[in-house]
Swiss-Prot record:
Residues 177-193, 439-452 have a biased composition (Basic and acidic residues). It comes from Homo sapiens. Residues 29-41, 95-111, 129-144, 163-176, 197-212, 231-245, 265-280, 299-314, 333-347, 376-394, 412-426 have a biased composition (Polar residues). It comes from the Eukaryota. Residues 1-452 are annotated as: Disordered. This is Uncharacterized protein FLJ40521.
Length: 452
């Protein structure tokens, strides 16, 4: 079943329930399979024209209700919306602006009195520029004559990409080290197959944000050795900047050399180490260095591999209980430190957090509300007088939260019954029971009468 938002009797919300034929998808607007709602060209006194029947295997246009058509937003007669119907040739995509295949709308270089110039024909297999309407061209945002938009047309050589800033292939715009009065210095020529730095215009260089002379931007040019990546902070390959354990008067200690092929820790500057945020002496930052065994990941909280920090069930006077050892290949619960368990937010004794441990059967997911697999909490159909209770339960008996799901079926979070849903209208305000809308029986018996 589905809910239909139009074509209904306002005094009878029952028409929201539209029965779905077997294996077919209902339209959420009409309740009829293979139909769509058309938002234009309809009789305002007759919403029935929303029902447009779809031919087999073809998609309807949501604006026109006709397959293989599109709505054109320009070049149309405002008194005749019928011109929205542009027939699409087989296998070709219509332009949403012009209604003509293989055309595009050009936002510049056109006669404002003649929208016909929107129709720019594309050669076979080539993409038109949305700015110029010419294939293999691009619009250049600088170095152009503001009185002559024609200079937007920069011709692209075969197989090469134009720079959107300069209109010249193999060039880039440099944001520093240039003469403000001469934008021509934006043109930095790229050597073959190498990428230019957007900051310096020189291949194989990078800009360093520290350890430089503020009066000499030339020190931005740090040459990169072959095949190695420069550090954006230091300009030296195989180094990293360390944010702790350094002399604030000597930025040189930012240079931590990395062994070949090994990644440095950004906190410690030592490979295969991590910074531990607890269990450390605040007067000795050296305890940040926790060595990781080969190929194993350290916990950022404990510095021990395959452990996790548990936020409950611990002695506040002893942080050591944060160390919960993980069994092989199994994930620990961050709340309990036990594998295949979950923390339940209700049905617990506030003086005994131990009841958070709910054991999960093999391969089944526990409900975070109830701690029982195949159950859900129901958030409606409750007694409005029981304010302390969040859902459909007896304040003295939380057990009624447990709604058992049949095998392999999903429970409704509103009703706790499979194959039902809650309807937000058409109900007796004094009787919330009418929220239970039952799914058709034949939908739950697949292949019972398929031969029919």
């Amino acid at each position: 079943m589905t809910a239909v938002s139009s074509n209904r009797n306002p005094e009878d919300d029952g028409c929201l329930l539209e029965q779905e034929p077997r294996g077919r998808r209902l339209s959420p607007r009409t309740g009829t399979p293979r139909t769509t709602a058309v938002s234009s060209n309809r009789d305002p006194k007759n919403d029935g024209c929303l029902l447009k029947q779809e031919p087999r295997g073809r998609r309807l246009s949501p604006r026109t209700g006709a397959p293989g058509t599109t709505a054109v937003s320009s070049n149309r007669n405002p008194e005749d919306d019928g011109c929205l119907l542009k027939q699409e040739p087989r296998g070709r995509r219509l332009s949403p602006q012009t209604g003509t295949p293989r055309t595009t709308a050009v936002s510049s270089n056109r006669n404002p009195g003649d929208d016909g110039c929107l129709l720019k024909q594309g050669p076979r297999g080539r993409r038109l520029s949305p700015q110029t309407g010419t294939p293999g061209t691009t619009a250049v945002s600088s170095n152009r004559n503001p009185e002559d938009d024609g200079c937007l047309l920069k011709q692209e050589p075969r197989g090469r990409r134009l720079s959107p800033q300069t209109g010249t292939p193999g060039t880039t715009a440099v944001s520093s080290n240039r003469d403000h009065e001469d934008d021509g210095c934006l043109l930095k020529q790229e050597s073959r197959g190498r990428r230019l730095s957007p900051q310096t215009g020189t291949p194989g260089t990078t800009a360093v944000s520290s350890n430089r002379n503020p009066e000499d931007d030339g020190c931005l040019l740090k040459q990169e050795s072959r095949g190695r990546r420069l550090s954006p902070q230091t300009g030296t390959p195989g180094t990293t900047a360390v944010s702790s354990n350094r002399d604030p008067e000597d930025d040189g200690c930012l240079l931590k050399q990395g062994p070949r092929g090994r990644r440095l820790s950004p906190q410690t500057g030592t490979p295969r180490t991590t910074a531990v945020s607890s269990n450390r002496n605040p007067e000795d930052d050296g305890c940040l260095l926790k060595q990781g065994p080969r190929g194993r990941r350290l916990s950022p909280q404990t510095g021990i591999p395959r452990t996790t920090a548990v936020s409950s069930n611990r002695d506040p006077g002893e942080d050591g209980c944060l160390l919960k050892q993980e069994s092989r290949g199994r994930r620990l619960s961050p709340q309990t430190g036990t594998t295949r368990t979950t923390a339940v937010s209700s049905k617990r004794n506030p003086e005994d957090d131990g009841c958070l441990l709910k054991q999960e059967p093999r391969g089944r997911r526990l409900s975070s509300l109830t701690g029982a697999p195949g159950t859900t909490a129901v958030s409606s159909n409750r007694d409005p007088r029981t304010t302390a209770v969040s859902s459909n339960r007896n304040p003295g008996d939380d057990g009624c939260l447990l709604k058992q799901g049949p095998r392999g079926r999903r429970l409704s979070p509103q009703t706790g019954t499979p194959g039902t849903t809650a309807v937000s209208s058409n109900r007796d305000p004094e009787d919330d029971g009418c929220l239970l809308k039952q799914e058709p029986q034949e939908l739950r018996k697949p292949e019972a009468d398929t031969a029919l």
